[in-house]
């Protein structure tokens, strides 16, 4: 887990700053799912850090089999949009069918359901 100090983006020595400044860094995931074989569509949610997904999301997509699956990123953000998120995630899992993501800040449950249904 990340502490408040880990997430202090104003401190260039914080854990999140160090991770995001090294694009090759891949934090470990405690436990990956056994299989995603029963799913055709995968939603992946995360906060936007520095206009992209945190590098742990790259860890995830590089270590699960998403080939041929529709992958839909969604995010929260303190002020930016999706930025270069999709461009940064695609090389980590080129076999997935990536769909343009969406920032979902403040969306009502109905608006979120409507968005997901259209995908």
Region annotations inferred by a language model:
Residues 40-42, 67-72, 98-99:
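Short, surface-exposed connector motifs at secondary-structure boundaries
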Residues 62-68, 92-93:
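Short, conserved loop/helix-junction motifs that constitute active-site signature segments
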Residues 47-52, 77-81:
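Gly/Ser/Thr-rich loops at beta-strand to alpha-helix junctions
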Residues 43, 66, 77-79:
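Short glycine/serine/threonine-biased micro-segments
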Residues 72-108:
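Short, glycine-/small-residue-rich phosphate/pyrophosphate-handling segment
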Residues 1-44, 51-53, 58, 62, ...:
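N-terminal beta1-alpha1-beta2 submodule of the flavodoxin-like/Rossmannoid cofactor-binding fold
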């Amino acid at each position: 887990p990340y502490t408040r100090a880990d997430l202090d983006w104003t401190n260039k020595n914080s854990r999140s700053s160090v991770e995001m400044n090294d694009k090759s860094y891949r934090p470990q995931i405690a436990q990956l799912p056994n299989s995603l074989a029963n799913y055709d569509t995968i939603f992946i949610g995360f906060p936007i850090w520095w206009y992209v997904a945190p590098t742990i999301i790259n860890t995830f997509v590089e270590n699960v089999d998403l080939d041929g699956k529709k992958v839909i990123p969604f995010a929260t953000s303190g002020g930016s949009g999706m930025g270069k998120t999709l461009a940064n995630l695609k090389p980590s899992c080129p076999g997935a069918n990536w769909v343009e993501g969406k920032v979902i800040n403040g969306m009502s449950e109905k608006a979120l359901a409507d968005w997901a249904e259209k995908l």
